[in-house]
Curated annotation (Swiss-Prot):
Residues 165-208 form a coiled coil. This is Uncharacterized protein TP_0625. The lineage of its organism: Bacteria, Pseudomonadati, Spirochaetota, Spirochaetia, Spirochaetales. InterPro entries: TPR-like_helical_dom_sf (IPR011990). Gene3D superfamilies: Tetratricopeptide repeat domain (1.25.40.10). It comes from the Bacteria.
Length: 250
């Protein structure tokens, strides 16, 4: 029986309580895996519905994803997309995690690995190697203790699958160049996202202003009418001045 990857994948993103937490399938016992089997059937129906949804869906757009979505929401949808066979949507949701939560180290490393793992499955060896080495560098850097340990093991496993297909000297040169360009790409994507957020906020403010305009116009008209009435009353009640040359009243 095929078990969906989203059930077997280690990490804190799953919304389902598991009997074998935060470790890859290879490190789970048969008894622990058996505890997961009861979740497969309901999830299969859910994935079937997702498959038909994607069959009719258009190309995903970042602005169509609600801002309230958390990393867990995005990761779950990415995993469901992958299990339903829609790689485009899966990669889109993983990339959205990177774009929206660049400071969430656990979310970033998880999304980075999943994107690399998709490339391994597609046998895009050099592209997969580039991403995997990028992840490995993160684990070798200072402060890596904050990163999920499971993805370090998974990265090494995938690297062992990729390396036999490459000339490592050439692959390492390309990976180094990739890491340099990738950092610049991430920076540009962050700047673009900030610009989109500003435009979205501006549109919301303009829409709010348009809703308030009729009421404001009505208030302005009423105030103008009141001012005119008060001016007319003051003019009518003002004392009349004597004609020129007429003696004042004693």
């Amino acid at each position: 029986m095929h078990v969906p990857r989203s059930i077997l994948r280690a990490g804190y993103f799953s919304q389902v309580k598991r009997t074998c937490d935060d470790v890859p399938m290879a490190f789970c016992s048969q008894a622990q895996l058996k505890g997961r089997s009861t979740m497969i059937k309901p999830r299969a129906y859910a994935l079937l519905g997702v498959f038909f949804l994607y069959a009719c869906a258009s190309t995903p757009r970042e602005e169509d994803v609600p801002e309230k979505f958390t990393p867990a929401d995005l990761m779950l949808r990415a995993q469901e997309s992958y299990d339903a066979g829609n790689i485009t949507w899966a990669r889109f949701y993983y990339q959205t995690v990177l774009d929206r939560f660049p400071n969430n180290e656990s979310a970033v490393i998880s999304a980075e690995f999943e994107l690399a793992h998709i490339l391994v499955k597609q046998k895009s060896w050099q592209d997969a190697y580039n991403r995997l080495m990028y992840i490995l560098k993160k684990y070798e850097a200072a402060g890596s203790a904050r990163l999920p340990p499971a993805y370090y093991k998974l990265t090494l496993i995938d690297l062992s699958r990729v390396k036999p297909h490459l000339n490592l000297e050439t692959a390492n040169t390309k990976a180094t160049e990739y890491q340099k360009n990738y950092q610049e790409e991430l920076k540009q994507r962050q700047e673009l996202r900030q610009k989109l957020l500003q435009e979205r906020t501006q549109k919301m403010l303009e829409a709010l202003h348009q809703e308030e305009t009729p009421e404001q116009d009505a208030r302005d008209t009423a105030k103008k009418k009141t001012d005119q009435e008060e001016h007319t009353m003051r003019k009518a009640n003002a004392p009349k001045t004597k004609a020129s040359g007429e003696a004042p009243t004693p």
